[in-house]
Amino acid sequence: LRDVAAIERRLGAVEALTKNTVAREELILSLSGISDMERLIGRIAYGTAGGRDFASLRNSIERITEVKAQLTAFTTGRLHELDNELDTLTDVAQSIRDTLIDEPPFSVREGGFIRKGYNAEVDRLHEILSGGKGLLADIETREKEKTGIRTLKIGYNKVFGYYIEVSNSFKDLVPDTYIRKQTLVNGERYITEELKNLEQEILTAGDRDKALEFEIFTALRESVTAESVRIQRAAGLIAELDTLCSLASVAVNNNYCRPSVDDSGVIEIHDGRHPVVERVLKDALFVPNDTYMGEREDRAAIITGPNMAGKSTYMRQVALITLMAQIGSFVPAKSARIGVVDRIFTRIGASDDLAGGQSTFMVEMTEVSEILHQATPRSLLILDEIGRGTSTFDGMSIARAVLEFCADPKRLGAKTLFATHYHELTELEGILPGVKNYSISIKKRGDELIFLRKIVPGGADRSYGIEVAKLAGLPNEVVKRANVILKELEQGGAYQAKPREETEQVSLDAIGEAEVLAAIRRAQPDTMSPIEAMQLLYELKQKLS
């Protein structure tokens, strides 16, 4: 967000949730039972939803009533607005509950998911599919009463299906509508039109039930889809509330503070911490750091210090705290004042783009180019070791030019955190207005290097690269040799690589021979005239000479 009023409104909601623990925990519990309604209504509208998707939507909607009841604890601010704006969608949930069973199957092609009592014909087909025992019992009772045959009973066999069996003692009471099918020792078996129709219904009930249930399901899908705008709006409000509860929970659990947000262009952080690094540290406490960046003074910070000292972590934490403040979140600091930025640009780390044919340095320069073209004076720039992918002088020149461009208010003048190992750049503090030197403090005890992780004013005097290499486990022989070479270089560049002219000449000869061989491979002697062959020989001889 870049509108201060919108940020403050969100911060106010987060603060209200941090202060009301009971309501916050109840809301989190209710929200945990709500599925992604936006995705569900999307599947329903596209016709790809199954029965379980409808059940998930129904269960989610029914939780909204709980959420609204819990929001009544907040009588002002954005949370009160959410209570007023949130649609309970009870009619949609009731429609799904009336139509479908509690736990419908995912596939709706096999039937068996319409709730009993919703449709009389579906209920009848379900009765038939269960063996028609109830229907057969009704027919048997009715026929006994109509004919007066007390021993009448209905049975089934595979030869002619359902039948009515009458004992010989009641044969005279058999009505003319009965059709005799089988004679037994003790009685007769008959069929009726009603039994034949019932048998036919039983044979076709499965297909008819599937078709009818799918027809009802399609109608339900269309009716729910018609309410998709309401459902999507409710889903958006639920997502906003879920975000606010999450931000409040994180703020309480990690001792975050509410930042002050304005349009001053000032970033002032007291005891800021990296929100991720402080959580993953197991055996040590995170060392907090202060930050001050203004629109005129301390606009650009040059940060020097050894590798592993914490330069990148510090710059990242400033960017993250700024970003967190502008999404309406509390921040990991004792206090923070954030002047709204329009964009945050970072150039940290790089690797080869093998598929694109770009080297590490080319990738780095491409990213820097995009930053310089897109950044504005209201942007925050995080630039880590620009120019390290090429030679020392080239890299230093590029780094200085980039820093001058970023810091100069006549060109860009954006707030910039610039980490570098080029200590020569620290002289810009006295040349460019708004540039300030900082370094990560360390302590050296004998050969041991202790990182204090604290950022302090002033540039570092050296990079301690060899000490860091030793910490990384380089062999002692290599470390000792590196120290010798470093001393020679520091004494005026006495250590120099000797030119290797012979190697260069061999390289040139090899290039000439390669060109000759390539020309011979391309030649087609069968199609060449004597003059053309002679001309080719002269050309090859000239290449070799």
Regions found by a protein language model. Give the residues of each.
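ATPase nucleotide-binding head domains, primarily ABC-like/P-loop NTPase cores
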Residues: 1, 167-199, 244-511, 517, ...
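Alpha-helical coupling/stalk and coiled-coil linker elements that connect catalytic or binding modules
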Residues: 1-309, 313-345, 367
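Amphipathic alpha-helical segments within well-ordered protein domains
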Residues: 15, 41-42, 221, 387, ...
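Short, amphipathic C-terminal "tail helix"
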Residues: 50-53, 525-545
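Dynamic helix-loop-helix/coil hinge segments at AAA+ ATPase domain boundaries and subdomain interfaces
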Residues: 226, 522-525
